[in-house]
Regions:
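A short, basic N-terminal segment
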Residues: 1-58, 77-81
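The catalytic "switch" region of P-loop NTPases
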Residues: 6-9, 168, 180-238
Length: 238
């Protein structure tokens, strides 16, 4: 049986053989120690393979209480630790009130250096919510700020603002959001794929099929790899 640590090392060696690139890893506080992966070697490799393939994104679904979130978090932490995944990982846990703009806000704020430097003062002045997100792109000057109205944040605008970000956005408990939000996220995934963005999306949710998690979006299937998680075999529980 492959050990928890060796599967990441094995995958790293495999990727290094395929493409000789400089991999980097910036240590930070772990999201989740990769200790929940016993018996999940195949799923871990599928996730890693998908998230390191150009234009591909990933979705984990299955019944409640089988370890979907733990698998996602532990795989991302292990992959980051070994340098096969980006060092910047954003985790959004949804609830019934979560909107598309809420999901996009975390990575958007991360790339907005001006907002990050003044977020306390800005938030205080703006009250409960900000009217705009000021997003910077590396290919435009500081004066050419892209202003995105939060109430009119479309998938195409979000993709344009974030497509150069080398990171992973984990959207957990995705099943509870509205169909409109699911459709917007699916369209966002498609546009990221079309633009060959290094920003990767990992969706996690309770479902018996992948289609319901993306509200039946017709053209996202080609770029969204589905992993249906089943209950772990008894032999791995002891």
């Amino acid at each position: 049986m492959t050990t928890t640590s060796s599967i990441f090392s094995k995958f790293k060696a495999k990727k290094n053989k395929i493409k000789n690139v400089d991999l980097y890893f910036t240590p930070s506080k772990p999201i989740e120690a990769p200790t929940h992966l016993k018996g999940r070697d195949n799923e871990v490799e599928h996730i890693l393979d998908t998230l390191t393939t150009d234009g591909k994104h990933c979705m984990i679904y299955g019944e409640r209480g089988i370890g979907k979130s733990s698998l996602a978090l532990s795989t991302l932490e292990g992959g980051k630790r070994e340098g096969v995944l980006p060092s910047d990982i954003f985790v959004v846990r949804c609830d019934k009130k979560t909107k598309f703009k809420d999901i996009i806000a975390r990575p958007a704020i991360f790339i907005d250096s001006e907002y990050a430097a003044n977020k306390r003062e800005t938030t205080k002045k703006a009250g409960v919510g900000l009217n705009v997100l000021k997003l910077f792109r590396t290919d435009v000057s500081a004066e050419e700020k892209i202003i995105i109205e939060k109430e009119d944040l479309t998938p195409s605008k979000a993709c344009f603002a974030l497509e150069e970000l080398n990171a992973i956005l984990l959207i957990d408990e995705f099943d509870v959001v509205s169909d409109d939000v699911k459709h917007d996220v699916a369209e966002f995934v498609k546009q990221l794929s079309d633009s060959n963005s290094p920003l990767k999306i990992l969706l996690v949710g309770i479902s018996s099929d992948g289609a319901s998690l993306i509200a039946g979006h017709p053209s996202v299937n080609r770029c969204l790899h589905e992993i249906q998680l089943s209950r772990i075999e008894d032999k791995y529980l002891h």
